C-alpha cells in the first residue's frame, strides 16, 4: 500500500485537479472564486434593473459584477464565455444620475475604465473584452459578484 504521506499528497493532487480554476470552498456551489469574491454567470435574459435585483436576492447577496483591474475583467470574460458560449453579459455599471457620475451598482467608485465616454447601462463582450453601452431596458445574460 505504501507510505501514507504519498497517499495524502496524491489525494491532494486529485482534489486540486477536480476543483478546477476558480473553485473555492468559500463560495456557494456553482459560484467561482477570484481574489476574495464569488462570481456566477446566469443564462437568463433580464433587463439591467432586473438582473441587479436578481443578484441582490442570491443567498450570498451581491450585485452585477464590477471590475477593479484588468485581471478581474479577464477572469470574468473567460468565465462568461466558457459557461454561456455567448458574447455579451450585463455588468454593474451605469450612469445612475445621467450626469456622467459613474459608479458600480454596489456603490464603489469607478477606478478602472474600459470604454469610450457614452451614457447608459453597460455590457462586456466576452470576446475581445470590450465594454459597450446598451439601453438598460434591453435584456442580456449577466454575471453576479459577491464577497467570498
From Swiss-Prot:
Instruction: Please give the Gene3D superfamilies that the UniProt record associates with this protein.
Output: Mannose-Binding Protein A, subunit A (3.10.100.10)
| Keywords (A to Z) from UniProt | Disulfide bond, Hemostasis impairing toxin, Secreted, Signal, Toxin
Keyword Manganese recorded = no
Instruction: Give the location in the cell.
Output: Secreted
Signal sequence bounds: 1-23
| A GO molecular-function annotation | toxin activity
Which body tissues produce this protein?
Expressed by the venom gland.
Q: Name the SUPFAM superfamilies for this protein.
A: C-type lectin-like (SSF56436)
Q: Which PROSITE patterns match?
A: C_TYPE_LECTIN_2
Q: Which terms in the GO cellular component ontology are assigned? A: extracellular region
Please list the disulfide bridges: 27-38, 55-144, 121-136
- Per UniProt, residues of the C-type lectin domain are 34-145
- Principal place of residence: secreted
Q: Which Pfam families match?
A: Lectin_C
Q: Does the keyword Secreted apply?
A: yes
Miscellaneous notes for this chain? Shows greater sequence similarity to the beta than alpha subunits compared to other heterodimer snaclecs.
Family, similarity comment: Belongs to the snaclec family.
Q: What does this protein do?
A: Interferes with one step of hemostasis (modulation of platelet aggregation, or coagulation cascade, for example).
- Subunit description: Heterodimer; disulfide-linked.
* Protein's name in the database: Snaclec 27
